């Protein structure tokens, strides 16, 4: 009291109420570049008014009235340390919930693998791929099902030095700039059979035919006339390689480099003689290449003609444009067909690029008698008396000539080589050289009466006529230079052999 006296002590016990804080539970989910935090909060004595989110272990918080929050713009494949708490209406906070969450990482992926540009010894592999979280840095390629790998920064790779006609199991995967890899994806491809051009690389065209087109008599309709084998008694015996039969793949595109060979530039291989390939024009020559000195045209008889020309210019063997001006001299050196049409006009009109590929040849133009080359002559007999033992030893050096009678005879199938030349019309379906229009050969008839040369009739037989009286279609014939090489082609009419220009 006022004078300093104290009362006695009164003791009692009092208990205050406990304050209930809010409580939380937290779940998280992630994508490549974001993390979403979801909070399930239970209020205590106050209402929940705000949520607080941190992605950097509590260094910085973002407040929100919402119970979920998404952190965007994150780095893929990265671990983030999350903290979350809530505040109630009385300013009281929950305990801090801690979570660890990593953003997802999208690996690079390969969606497509294809094989292209397949040859006999190479295959190109093409890859379609996406980078995922990072860009692609390298492509890995295997040709042996993943045993060994090569790598490149390019999405295509060409395997070379492969074996022909072999199936390869190719595998591919990619890596990104962070070193992450895709899964492997594969494709199988079989290398081609070697093309003739590949097999003949570095060889002359003549050697290519002898060593790669010819394998044995009859294969590819090609026969070696070496006096050996089934037809040895009927062969020429000159070691030539000759195409025989109905329609061998012996086409050559000569005089043009366009993708589809014009029909006027199609030639066919008679054979290989020594180191030279001998060609004959597939169809009859036009005025544009042979020029003047023709005497009218002929409309081919559709019953016989095998070509596509609407009309064919006709030339006398002696060469003038009118038989009134012709001589009946059947000497090839004096023929204007030879000197003007073939060895001047034709050579000039095909151009120097192509004429320079034609060899100057010693043509055997001595000829022989009616009996030796026609009436009593088989194909071999005709060859003997036309080439080996002509009536005269006359030769003529020039680039362009016409077919020999024996060329025509040996173009028929070998089972017909014992036919008489006068009966070759019976086997025209087995003779690729037959075209169905009268045409001159280079071979003169010797003896009397004079002034005659042999020709192939429209029905496929052999006959003779006066050089100043009959006019026929002309198919230039020549030997290629020995150094000419093959560039491409299979020898078919649609894919003829192409020569290196």
What are these regions (language model features)?
Residues 19-27, 106-115:
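Proline-enriched interdomain boundary motifs that mark the N-terminal boundary
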Residues 42-56, 130-144:
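Solvent-exposed loop/turn segments flanking beta-strands in beta-repeat/beta-sandwich domains
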Residues 1-5, 71-92, 159-180:
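Beta-strand-rich modules
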Residues 3-19, 90-105, 177-193:
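Extracellular fibronectin type III
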């Amino acid at each position: 009291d006022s004078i300093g006296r104290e009362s006695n002590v009164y003791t009692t016990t009092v208990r205050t109420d406990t304050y209930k804080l809010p409580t939380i539970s937290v779940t998280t989910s992630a994508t490549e570049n974001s993390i979403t935090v979801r909070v399930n909060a239970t209020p205590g004595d106050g209402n929940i008014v705000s949520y607080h989110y941190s992605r950097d272990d509590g260094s910085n918080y973002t407040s929100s009235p919402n119970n979920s929050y998404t952190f965007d713009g994150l780095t893929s494949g990265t671990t983030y340390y999350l903290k979350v708490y809530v505040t109630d209406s009385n300013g009281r906070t929950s305990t801090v919930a801690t979570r660890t969450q990593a953003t997802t990482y999208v690996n690079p992926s390969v969606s497509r693998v294809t094989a292209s540009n397949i040859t006999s010894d190479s295959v190109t592999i093409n890859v379609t791929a996406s980078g995922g979280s990072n860009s692609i840095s390298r492509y890995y390629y295997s040709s042996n099902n993943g045993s060994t790998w090569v790598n490149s920064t390019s999405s295509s790779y060409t395997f070379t030095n492969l074996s022909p006609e072999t199936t390869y199991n190719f595998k591919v995967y990619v890596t990104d700039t962070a070193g992450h890899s895709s899964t492997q994806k594969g494709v199988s491809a079989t290398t081609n059979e070697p093309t003739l051009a590949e097999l003949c690389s570095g060889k002359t065209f003549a050697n290519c035919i002898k060593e790669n087109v010819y394998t044995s008599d009859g294969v590819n309709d090609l026969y070696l006339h070496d006096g050996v084998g089934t037809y040895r008694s009927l062969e020429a015996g000159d070691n030539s390689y000759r195409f025989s039969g109905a329609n061998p793949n012996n086409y050559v595109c000569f005089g043009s480099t366009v993708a589809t060979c014009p029909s006027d530039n199609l030639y066919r291989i008679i054979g290989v003689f020594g180191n030279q390939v001998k060609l004959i024009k597939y169809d009859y020559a036009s005025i544009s290449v042979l020029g003047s000195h023709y005497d009218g045209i002929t409309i081919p008889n559709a019953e016989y003609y095998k070509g596509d020309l609407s009309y064919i210019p006709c030339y006398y063997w002696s060469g003038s444009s009118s038989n009134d001006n012709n001589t009946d001299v059947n000497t090839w050196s004096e023929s204007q067909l030879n000197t003007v049409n073939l060895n001047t006009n034709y050579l000039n009109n095909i151009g120097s690029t192509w004429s320079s590929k034609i060899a100057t040849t010693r043509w055997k133009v001595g000829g022989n008698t009616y009996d030796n080359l026609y009436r009593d002559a088989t194909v071999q007999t005709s060859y003997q008396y036309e080439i080996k033992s002509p009536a005269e030893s006359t030769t003529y050096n020039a680039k362009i000539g016409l077919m020999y009678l024996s060329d025509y005879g040996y173009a028929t199938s070998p089972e017909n080589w014992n036919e008489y030349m006068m009966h070759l019309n019976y086997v025209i379906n087995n003779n690729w050289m037959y075209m169905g229009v009268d045409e001159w050969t280079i071979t003169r008839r010797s003896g009397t009466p004079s002034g005659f040369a042999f020709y192939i009739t429209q029905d496929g037989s052999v006959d003779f006529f006066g050089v100043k009286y009959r006019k026929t279609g002309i198919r230039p014939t020549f030997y290629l230079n020995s150094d000419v090489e093959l560039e491409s082609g299979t020898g078919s009419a649609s894919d003829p052999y192409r020569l290196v220009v």
